[in-house]
Swiss-Prot record:
Transmembrane segments: 8-28, 75-95, 105-125, 151-171, 177-197, 234-254, 258-278, 298-318
Organism listed in the record: Xenopus laevis
PROSITE patterns per record: COMPLEX1_ND1_1 (PS00667), COMPLEX1_ND1_2 (PS00668)
Catalytic activity: a ubiquinone + NADH + 5 H(+)(in) = a ubiquinol + NAD(+) + 4 H(+)(out)
Ribonucleoprotein as UniProt keyword: no
UniProt GO cellular component terms: mitochondrial inner membrane; respiratory chain complex I
InterPro entries in alphabetical order: NADH_UbQ_OxRdtase_su1/FPO, NADH_UbQ_OxRdtase_su1_CS
Family as reported in the entry's similarity comment: Belongs to the complex I subunit 1 family.
Enzyme Commission number(s) from the entry: 7.1.1.2
Gene: mt-nd1
HAMAP family found in the cross-reference section: NDH1_NuoH
Name this polypeptide is given: NADH-ubiquinone oxidoreductase chain 1
Key words, A-Z: Electron transport, Membrane, Mitochondrion, Mitochondrion inner membrane, NAD, Respiratory chain, Translocase, Transmembrane, Transmembrane helix, Transport, Ubiquinone
Gene Ontology molecular-function annotations: NADH dehydrogenase (ubiquinone) activity
Length: 323
């Protein structure tokens, strides 16, 4: 009985801090955008607006969940629930001091779950029975699938550099030197691709207000809309945490778990702030430019980098030992 309770409580204790971080990320985003546009941002609810995310959450969840009469009711409700479930599950194998799951193929697990998120977007757009929602969903799916190719190839390069699929191997590899130093072109492409993968500005074509109102979640209101929003921001935090681990900024304090956690929090926060900075600074890309960027620029470069990382160790096999 105690084991069952532990298996229920552990994931809950893991998810609550993530959801709290997501809530306050929305507040930080509004504050950052406010100050960059020479205004205050939220500053009424609580001291300097600190309780604003809680007020927003309560407001959304007590609203009546309006569903279009012509929509596919079951799929309409499953899509946001599945989106949040996937966004939470993807955090499980992270190499925290006391992680929830230690997977041998942790990187492939992340890649597989991030690919599954496409189905929630497609399901929500199709089940809404709205032209705008469907067009937004198709755009999002095409964009996500396109950039996943680049992300997969960059991950392959990192795996070959580190020599393993586990997060612990990647962390140990970076004890002496961050991988951003030998792999800075991949770091730049990874960061831009994560912006596109999470549908953030300047790649937020899925919610182009001028043509699509709000994109794939146009028919959602109240609780289901809040679930989509939580999933989106959880994925942003996840991608930045992954950038910290794999991309190139990881470091291992295996004997000092507190330092590991603090290091992860600080670096992920800085990378998330850059996401917000990019949103405040850049206009939205045109859709054809978005696709040209990945298929005509990023894909050839990442393929060349992959071939380089495969061929270099093979070509060095004949050299005598340097030790």
């Amino acid at each position: 009985m105690l084991t069952i309770i532990t298996h229920l409580i552990n994931p809950l204790l893991y998810m609550i801090p993530i959801l709290l971080a997501v809530a306050f990320l929305t507040l930080i985003e509004r504050k950052v955008l406010g100050y960059m546009q020479h205004r205050k941002g939220p500053n009424i609810v609580g001291p300097t607006g600190l309780i604003q995310p809680i007020a927003d959450g309560v407001k959304l969840f007590i609203k009546e969940p309006v569903r279009p009469s012509t929509s596919s009711q079951t799929m309409f409700l499953i899509a946001p629930t599945m989106a949040l479930a996937l966004a939470m599950s993807i955090w499980a194998p992270l190499p925290m001091p006391f992680s929830l799951a230690d997977l041998n193929l942790g990187i492939l697990f992340i890649l597989a779950l991030s690919s599954l998120a496409v189905y929630t977007i497609l399901g929500s757009g199709w089940s809404s029975n709205s032209k705008y929602a469907l067009i937004g969903a198709l755009r999002a799916v095409a964009q996500t699938i396109s950039y996943e190719v680049t992300l997969g190839l960059i991950l392959l390069c990192m795996i070959m550099l580190a020599g393993g699929f586990t997060y612990t191997t990647l962390m140990t590899t970076q004890e002496q030197m961050w991988l951003i130093i030998p792999g800075w072109p991949m770091a730049a492409m990874w960061y831009i691709s994560t912006l596109a993968e999470t549908n953030r500005a300047p790649f937020d074509l899925t919610e182009g207000e001028s043509e699509l109102v709000s994109g794939f979640n146009v028919e959602y209101a109240g609780g289901p809309f809040a679930l989509f929003s939580l999933a989106e921001y959880a994925n942003i935090l996840m991608m930045n945490t992954l950038s910290y681990l794999i991309l190139f900024l990881g470091s291992s304090f295996m004997n000092q778990p507190e330092l590991t956690t603090i290091s992860l929090m600080i670096k992920s926060s800085i990378l998330s702030m850059i996401f917000l900075w990019v949103r405040a600074s850049y206009p939205r890309f045109r859709y054809d430019q978005l696709m040209h960027l990945v298929w005509k620029n990023f894909l050839p470069i990442t393929l060349a980098m992959t071939l380089w990382h495969i061929s270099l160790p093979i070509s060095m096999l004949g050299l005598p030992s340097q030790t």
